[in-house]
């Protein structure tokens, strides 16, 4: 029998300690991983609701289980809010993740062995855009495009590759690209070779929802996203379209369920509904505007301190810092900053001489720090601290600089908590 006063702390102290330690880590570390964000207490409340218990195979109004009347309300709320948020005609809120959303799109539009054209992982793409280690590069014949030495997409190169390989589907989207993608140009290329245009907007969905980054819906046949990252909701996936083709919509529905998934995670769908409602609020646009302002402010500090920023700047929430000139590695920078309670991730940069697990750069993102209240002055100061640590790498004062920086980080984290008590 269950009682309301059952706790993890009493039942499983080892697990509870790990949860408490993670809570403390998030509060005492500055999070700059571009794909991470903080979900609101409302989102987490929905994830912990009794919908955790409910099986709901099928779609609203057409379920394979009884007792789904409230699950139907939740899922329809999420669908309707996502349609309003992004201007979509079709929405599927059931994908468990961005990768599963992408798998469902491939399954709906093309067949095994067909050719896809996507951005190279080493140039800022994603595993599911055709990387050979991913299902997308194993099931399908993947051809990859990249970026120029300046860190920009070369659309003529994309076009030439499309003309050569005649893909059935072109993937546009990224995991580490700091500029604005020309969705219209990508659609033009897709139309020229008779391919579908599939956009993965996972990294910039929040900016798009706020009207601060070009919306791909008017140009793409199908769009996917995660619901965390810039969007700031639960970890999950989403498929959208405004192509007007009912046959494509039907194929997408059946490709999610029953082809790729069984029962949806109704508690996560409830959390998605909360997230979409939050994103429709006026203050959400202000938040996303500050995300971009903070990224631009940090870029200027890195450049002033002598570090190269890929593409020379950013037009979204992230940027890449290259250490090729300094002879440093992303791995060493990642580790040193981590000791100072600043979390980033090592990342490959254009013409990177290092191996993928070493790299010559880091990726920096501002959604999390902005959500906890950092303003432009705060992030300029933060970028300066990061440069102090990077400047000291391999020198006698390295540990001293790291220790001094950590104290500054702890102080600002105390002033700007993630979840104020």
UniProtKB/Swiss-Prot annotation:
One of its GO terms (biological process) is glycine biosynthetic process from serine. GO terms for molecular function: glycine hydroxymethyltransferase activity; pyridoxal phosphate binding. Its EC number is 2.1.2.1. The modification N6-(pyridoxal phosphate)lysine is found at residue 229. InterPro entries: PyrdxlP-dep_Trfase (IPR015424), PyrdxlP-dep_Trfase_major (IPR015421), PyrdxlP-dep_Trfase_small (IPR015422), Ser_HO-MeTrfase (IPR001085), Ser_HO-MeTrfase-like (IPR049943), Ser_HO-MeTrfase_PLP_BS (IPR019798), SHMT-like_dom (IPR039429). It is an enzyme of class 2 (transferase). Catalyzes the reversible interconversion of serine and glycine with tetrahydrofolate (THF) serving as the one-carbon carrier. This reaction serves as the major source of one-carbon groups required for the biosynthesis of purines, thymidylate, methionine, and other important biomolecules. Also exhibits THF-independent aldolase activity toward beta-hydroxyamino acids, producing glycine and aldehydes, via a retro-aldol mechanism. This is Serine hydroxymethyltransferase. It comes from Haemophilus influenzae (strain 86-028NP).
């Amino acid at each position: 029998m269950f009682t309301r006063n059952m706790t993890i702390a009493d039942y499983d102290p080892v697990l509870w300690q790990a949860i408490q330690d993670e809570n403390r880590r998030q509060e005492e570390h500055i999070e700059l991983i571009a794909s991470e964000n903080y979900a609101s207490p409302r989102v987490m409340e929905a994830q912990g609701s009794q919908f955790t218990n409910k099986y709901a195979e099928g779609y609203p109004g057409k379920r394979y289980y009884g007792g789904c009347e409230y699950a139907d309300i939740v899922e329809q709320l999420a669908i309707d809010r996502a349609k309003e948020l992004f201007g979509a005609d079709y929405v599927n809120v059931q994908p468990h993740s961005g990768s599963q959303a992408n798998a469902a799109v491939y399954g709906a539009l093309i067949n095994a062995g067909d050719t896809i054209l996507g951005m190279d992982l080493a140039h800022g793409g994603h595993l599911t855009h055709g990387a050979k280690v991913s299902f997308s590069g194993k099931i399908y014949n993947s051809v990859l495009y990249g970026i120029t030495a300046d860190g920009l997409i070369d659309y003529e190169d994309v076009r030439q590759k499309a003309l050569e390989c005649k893909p059935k589907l072109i993937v546009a989207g990224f995991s580490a690209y700091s500029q604005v993608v020309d969705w219209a140009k990508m659609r033009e290329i897709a139309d020229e070779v008779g391919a579908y245009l599939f956009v993965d907007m996972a990294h910039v969905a929040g900016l798009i929802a706020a009207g601060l980054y070009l919306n791909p819906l008017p140009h793409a046949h199908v769009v996917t996203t995660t619901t965390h990252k810039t969007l700031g909701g639960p970890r999950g996936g989403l498929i959208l379209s405004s192509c007007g083709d009912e046959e494509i919509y039907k194929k997408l529905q059946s490709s999610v369920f029953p082809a790729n998934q069984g029962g949806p995670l109704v508690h996560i769908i409830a959390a998605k509904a909360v997230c979409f409602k939050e994103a429709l609020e006026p203050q959400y646009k202000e938040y996303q505007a500050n995300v971009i302002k903070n990224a631009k402010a940090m870029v200027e500090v890195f450049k002033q301190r002598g570090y190269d920023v890929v593409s020379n700047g950013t037009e979204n929430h992230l940027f890449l810092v290259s250490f090729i000139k300094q002879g440093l590695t992303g791995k060493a920078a990642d580790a040193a900053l981590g000791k100072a309670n600043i979390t980033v991730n090592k990342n490959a940069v254009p013409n990177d001489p290092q191996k993928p697990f070493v790299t010559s750069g880091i990726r920096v993102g501002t959604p999390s720090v902005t959500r906890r209240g950092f303003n432009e002055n705060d992030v300029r100061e933060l970028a300066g601290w990061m440069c102090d640590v990077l400047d000291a790498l391999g020198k006698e004062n390295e540990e001293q600089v790291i220790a001094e920086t950590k104290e500054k980080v702890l102080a600002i984290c105390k002033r700007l908590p993630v979840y104020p008590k």
